[in-house]
């Protein structure tokens, strides 16, 4: 592990609508502790002294972003969101190039709806991967018993959970390598669910860095309620 923390750029893909939340607005704009989820997700990066700049990918017709105080932050640039996450991230990487980022610069991609990232986890990721030839991501070992099922919901087998980890964010890779992996996988119409899967598709083996299990992504209403209760108990 490196004792230094490398400088980095951050990308936040925030063009999704979060349909499973069944809310009146995209989930990243729901309130949590007096601010939007997106503002919390951005905050851990904006507070970090090693940040070189940040790009947030937004839907072209996003009516909520301009009302946020952070929209005027000069460290934040806006990129056009794509129809899928990979397109949003790719557009953000192109924006980073325009800002002067080089192919060997580190880029951290973080979910817009993952507001509980701790500074300790961010520092751990940066330190552990500072000299890594590939990069990697925060992740958490599977704790529950896992079942593989058929299309009818019948159990086929119990999976060895010692080999299974849940992928979290941030995910940290060199700009040039990530750009090539995403662009090539899109041309090949490969199934890409996160940046690590694009790197895997390109033949790389990202490293997993164990993080906190409470760095959850808000996907369903109960996730947001859990965070609200947890944050209320901190007071």
From Swiss-Prot:
The gene is ispD. It holds the Pfam family IspD. One of its GO terms (biological process) is isopentenyl diphosphate biosynthetic process, methylerythritol 4-phosphate pathway. It catalyses: 2-C-methyl-D-erythritol 4-phosphate + CTP + H(+) = 4-CDP-2-C-methyl-D-erythritol + diphosphate. The record marks 20, 27 as: Transition state stabilizer. PANTHER family: 2-C-METHYL-D-ERYTHRITOL 4-PHOSPHATE CYTIDYLYLTRANSFERASE, CHLOROPLASTIC. This is 2-C-methyl-D-erythritol 4-phosphate cytidylyltransferase. GO terms for molecular function: 2-C-methyl-D-erythritol 4-phosphate cytidylyltransferase activity. The record marks 161, 217 as: Positions MEP for the nucleophilic attack. Belongs to the IspD/TarI cytidylyltransferase family. IspD subfamily.
